[in-house]
């Protein structure tokens, strides 16, 4: 099974599939060379990006991520403030130190190719890395796929049409929403309780709790950074940061908040904008479950901790565990990759997870939590991924804010009912998968349709 820490991982913006994944793949390739004693034989490297990676790689920073990964950087620890200077130095010098130890000639314009119209068979986000010796002979070639949320699968697993599963036995295995509800009925556990029992299969309960609270800390720090920085986002669209200005407006608002019943929603919008502006700027974020949708769960969690009486760290833990359980269902039965199923797989999944998490934290029954997740996804079906300029800015940043409000609405609506509803979460996940399969490629993170072409034409 997938762990909650696979779904919530610390990384770098602007994209989990297009930045975090390529960085991990590149680092894995050169680390493998070193492990086999081949790294010092390398004189030249070649990297190729295909499909959605090739089409929007420049806007998503995929090319930069590959350079950093080859140099040994890891998404969870790379110095985000030093990325620009490090990449610029590689480009200016035409030299790259593999794993920061073995230096070779590397000209990005020659040795790093983005194929805008070519795809590999398994997944739209394909990469090929090759290493050569001083005689030009190939030392090793490997193919990797970035399948969403920072997950990377190599060619062998892709050929088996699956990611190699973790064989660690968990206490309460489940692959569908129906199975999850059956487990809760049989054990009397909440959804977060089931997930916690499973997480203990990998690490101690104390480590699970500490790890999740650390994830929450990184989310809070991301919001704080986003709320403190003005200016224009990189990439050429001249998108202005709005979170800092909105925060100042809310903090100095002379209008009595009690006079506006929707005042809290402005704060939720702020929290989401802050995260996604940081993500667009290449800052430190938590995949939740992807970078493109990274603002939704932190925004709804901030809503819970700041505006719900009696909110606690225990509630935060229940929120993240329940959200993770729903994320497992999307990852196992559909996709969280915009390049595979459109934005319904990213923002839709995150909205569903956040709705479930909030319903859990507010004391919902398993049936109500499942209902909240279903509502959150149902009303994101068909959502396209059409980033203007191939950047994770328009419509992505505002879309996270809107989905955060939608997640809160879904949770509150579910909690007003008894959990009985006409459409199951499993049916909605199946529908999302089928809708994504039917969706044209131009609406799946290629910047060749929708807003990506109409905004520029206007």
Residue spans of the language-model regions?
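C-terminal regulatory domains involved in ligand/effector binding and gene-expression control
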Residues: 75-256, 267
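Conserved phosphate/anionic-ligand binding catalytic regions in large, soluble enzymes, centered on
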Residues: 8-26, 281-300, 343-352
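Hydrophobic alpha-helical bundle architecture
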Residues: 311, 322, 329-401, 413-422
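Short alpha-helical scaffolding segments that buttress acidic/His motifs in well-ordered protein cores
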Residues: 8-11, 268-276, 319-327, 372-376, ...
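Short, mixed-charge aromatic SLiMs
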Residues: 44-57, 89-97, 244-246, 319-332, ...
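Extended hydrophobic packing segments that form well-structured cores
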Residues: 422-458
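Alpha-helical support elements that line or immediately flank enzyme active sites
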Residues: 17-34, 298-310, 355-363
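Accessory "access/gating" subregions that flank catalytic or transport cores
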Residues: 203-342, 450-458
């Amino acid at each position: 099974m997938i762990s909650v820490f696979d779904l919530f991982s610390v990384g770098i913006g602007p994209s989990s599939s297009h930045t975090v994944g390529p960085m991990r793949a590149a680092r894995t390739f050169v680390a493998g060379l070193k492990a086999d004693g081949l790294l010092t034989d390398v004189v030249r490297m070649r990297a190729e990006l295909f499909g959605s990676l090739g089409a929007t790689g420049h806007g998503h920073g995929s090319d930069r991520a590959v350079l950093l990964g080859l140099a040994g950087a890891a998404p969870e620890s790379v110095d985000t403030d030093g990325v620009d200077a490090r990449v610029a130095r590689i480009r200016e010098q035409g030299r790259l130190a593999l794993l920061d130890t073995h230096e070779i000639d590397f000209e990005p314009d020659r040795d790093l190719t983005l194929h805008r119209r070519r795809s590999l068979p398994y997944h739209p986000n394909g990469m090929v890395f090759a290493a050569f010796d001083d005689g030009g002979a190939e030392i090793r070639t490997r193919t990797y796929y970035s399948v969403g949320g920072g997950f990377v699968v190599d060619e062998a697993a892709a050929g088996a049409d699956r990611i190699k599963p973790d064989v660690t036995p968990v206490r309460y295995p489940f692959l569908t929403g129906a199975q999850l509800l059956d487990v809760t009925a049989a054990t009397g556990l909440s959804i977060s309780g089931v997930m916690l029992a499973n997480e203990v299969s990998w690490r101690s309960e104390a480590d699970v709790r500490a790890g999740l609270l650390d994830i929450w800390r990184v989310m809070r720090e991301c919001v704080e950074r986003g709320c403190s920085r003005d200016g224009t986002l990189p990439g050429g669209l001249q998108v202005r940061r709005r979170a800092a200005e909105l925060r100042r407006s809310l903090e100095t608002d002379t209008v009595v908040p009690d006079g506006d019943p929707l005042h809290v929603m402005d704060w939720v919008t702020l929290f989401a904008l802050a995260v996604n502006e940081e993500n667009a700027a290449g800052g430190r974020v938590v995949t939740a479950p992807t970078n493109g949708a990274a603002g939704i769960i932190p925004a709804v969690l901030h809503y819970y901790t700041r505006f719900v009486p009696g909110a606690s760290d225990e509630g935060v833990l229940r929120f993240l565990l329940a959200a993770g359980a729903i994320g497992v269902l999307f990852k196992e039965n559909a996709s969280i990759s915009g390049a595979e199923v459109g934005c319904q797989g990213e923002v839709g999944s995150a909205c569903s997870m956040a709705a479930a998490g909030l319903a859990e934290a507010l004391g919902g029954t398993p049936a109500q939590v499942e209902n909240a997740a279903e509502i959150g996804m149902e009303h994101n079906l068909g959502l396209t991924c059409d980033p203007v300029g191939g950047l994770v800015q328009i419509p992505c940043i505002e879309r996270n804010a809107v989905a955060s409000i939608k997640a809160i609405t879904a949770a509150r609506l579910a909690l007003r009912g008894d959990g009985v509803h006409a459409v199951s979460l499993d049916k909605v996940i199946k529908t999302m998968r089928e809708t994504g399969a039917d969706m044209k490629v131009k609406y799946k993170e290629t910047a060749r349709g929708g807003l990506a072409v109409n905004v520029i034409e206007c």
